[in-house]
Design a protein with these regions (language model features):
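N-terminal glycine-/charge-rich "phosphate-binding" loop or analogous flexible N-terminal tail
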Residues: 1-46
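Short beta->alpha connector loops at strand-helix junctions that form conserved
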Residues: 32, 73-74, 90-101
Length: 304
């Protein structure tokens, strides 16, 4: 069977091996990225498709009758029309919980950047401001202590639990939304760790933000679609909340018109929470395990 990978670069820009997948197929073709108008020609008669973010529509599946298996390289698979796949007898798998430690680490890193302003102070030193200072230390913005601060967690799966574990080790008070909605919403930090569904898309709207504690910080390392970006931008500018730290946006990469770009108290990283080499290797390992299970008649991580 032939395998086509539509968007392999973000998983393996050249520092890993595709060998485990190559061992399971007759031919492996890897594209760094695939625009929508190239999807049909690149998939062609191949039986197996691997993708992360490409939109896999019913129309594409129907035009590729040889397609038998779609492997998502992510935990979320909103980009795949799973109902269409089920209707057409195409297996779909995902990779759950592979990035727990990395995403939790990045969540805490974003929180620490908000409280300690590491980047700001490094830039200040590199610009010579410490050399010109008459004191042995200085700070451009107040540095906040996390000990005793509260963290509200919305979405208490593997990542949410790991974030809670680290936060408690730092002396924070953790409020889990499913146990205490009011406590979570009124925390000093509110961190999103829930999947994106039709029901919760855009749930971080004006009402949500106004109900947060004044001066609180929103953190999102889950899915960009959970947040109404215009509402968040307006809330930040109006001072309803103290800041935001985001690793995901509704559109990735964002357009230059994204309302969150250029806002001083909004930190954005380019969806890098999952990218440590160990995590990307885990993706390839899990892809191979899922595919081998399907080839052997198994159901490992099936979502169709």
């Amino acid at each position: 069977m032939d395998i086509v990978i539509f968007d392999g670069y973000t998983i393996n820009p050249g520092d890993l091996s595709w060998g485990k997948l190559e061992a399971l197929c007759g031919r492996l073709t890897v594209f760094d990225a695939t625009p929508p108008d190239k999807a049909l020609s690149r998939l062609g008669d191949s039986e197996i498709l691997i993708t992360s973010k490409c939109q896999i529509t019913r129309e594409l599946m129907e035009k590729c009758p040889n397609l038998k298996y779609i492997g998502s390289t992510a935990t979320g698979y909103n980009n795949i029309d799973v109902k269409a796949a089920a209707d057409l007898g195409i297996a779909v798998t995902n990779i759950p919980a592979y990035s727990t430690n990395a995403v939790a680490q990045h969540t805490i890193a974003l929180m620490l950047e908000i409280t300690n302003h590491v980047g700001l102070h490094d830039r200040s030193v590199q610009q010579g401001q410490w050399c010109e200072c008459e004191y042995f230390c200085y700070w451009k913005k107040p540095v906040l202590l996390l000990t005793g601060k509260s963290l509200g967690i919305i979405g208490y799966g593997a990542i949410g639990k790991k974030v809670a574990e680290i936060a408690r080790a730092l002396g924070m008070i953790v409020n889990v939304y499913s146990d205490d909605p009011e406590g979570a919403m009124k925390s000093d930090f509110v961190s999103l760790h829930c999947p994106l569904t039709e029901e919760n898309a855009g749930m971080v709207n004006t009402e949500f933000l106004v109900n947060m504690k004044p001066g609180a910080v929103l953190i999102n390392t889950a899915r960009g679609g959970l947040v109404d970006e215009r509402a968040l931008a307006d809330a930040l500018k109006a001072g309803f909340i103290g800041g935001a730290a985001l690793d995901v946006l509704a559109e990735e990469p964002p357009s230059k018109n994204c309302p969150l770009l250029g806002i001083e108290n909004c930190i954005i990283t380019p969806h890098i929470a999952w990218v440590p080499k160990e995590m990307r290797q885990a993706v390839i390992d899990n892809l191979a395990e899922n595919l081998k299970s399907w080839l052997d008649g198994g159901m490992l991580n099936r979502v169709d």
